[in-house]
Amino acid sequence: MIETCDVAIIGAGPAGANAGIMAASQGCHTIIIDEQAMPGGQIWRAKSEAIKSAPMTPEIIDGDKLRVSIAESNLTHIANARVWQIERELDEWVLHFIINGRSEKIGAKVLILATGAREYVQPTPGWTLPGVIGLAGATALMKRDLLTPGKRTVVSGTGPLVFFVASEIRRLGGEVAAIVTPNSRADWLRALPSMSYRIDLLRRGFVWVADLLLAGIPIFWRHAKKQIDGETKVQSVKVTKLGNDWSPKGPAHLLEADSVCLGHGLQAASEASQLLGIDVKYQLELGGWVPEVQEDGITKINGLFICGDGAGIRGAAAAEIQGKLAGLAAAKSIRPEVNSSNLALLNSYRRASRFGMAMTGLSIPRKGFQKLITQETIVCRCESLLRCDIENEIETGAATTNAVKSGSRAGMGPCGGKYCQSTIAKIIADRENQSEEKIAPPTPRPPLRPVSASALSGEFEYTDLQIPKPAPL
């Protein structure tokens, strides 16, 4: 027999944690499984236990409140666990996860997916050099360990995260060589009406930019990194001006640095929902391919709910509220007496979504941006495949990401295609003169996360193996 519960939740970020707290408050036996050591997700990531004290930030304050709420609730939090397979057995969900090097499983009547997002980083010549890190990875490093990516850093990318990362680097004592962003000042001005729904966050963003400008840090608007150079590590970055479609235009500028942070928006981590049979649709304003789900997390499959960035990139504030809505709806599906109607919560979710979607809109790369990916740029890091390798597959007839994967192994490495498949889809769309929404996402396959053979085999003695007798002569 395996342990069973009413509600199982994958992910303990703003969405998953609040879904769990809400479901538990309605009397449901609730279990949250999360990869991290502490709840909070990326946005509210906890400091390392080795750090005894640190200046308080809004993220630390909100994260600590969340962790206290979880500790005071009746839910069970399973930390440092990676879900690698989900199955449906009769009327119950069965979740297989790796913890302490072994595969365990639990059963649940209802499943809530709060799997969050992954960062899209467009490949650039030199992006595999030591010293290059994603914007999201840099925030994790700084929030958890209070460490800067390097001594002198170029921060490059789209949307608001470049300004947050640059501000945090300065706060922690690092040097920002420059900020390089494809966005223009006009892009930000056009987004202002939607950002007015969260004046507090808008004000905070203004403070970031003002502090950076007062510190004399150059901001290269409507620019992008063209190449990262160095023999064994980052030594310099070439940046170039962009046209309105973000294609390179004009001469390159050289910036000396020993580290680079780069990122180009977020995408819903929808592999688990697709694996379970949820249809996805292309919504550029939500980051690309997203699962079909209602505002309260309800899906077409009974007993399956999705919330947070895994349902579309609307930002942490919206994810927190949608988690509460999904937790209520999940509790209602088990305990009919639960009142799941909450108009005030729904209206708050819609307001927060407008702000988050405005930020997503600023983060989405435009069509000309991929011209920065040269033929000799590594696209698939796991298999060391270049853009020219991908285009060779397309020329032989591969018109989908699945076909490119079959012919080249792109996406078959440890990351499961999370680094390369979006870029490959963009390359296919460009070569076939199609819109990206015409290029279906790759078909997800188990395991959802890398899993070792030893974890699956469990503990056994070689003497227990049944060895057949030698065949008679």
Residue map of PLM features:
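Residues forming the flavin
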Residues: 1-408, 414, 418-473
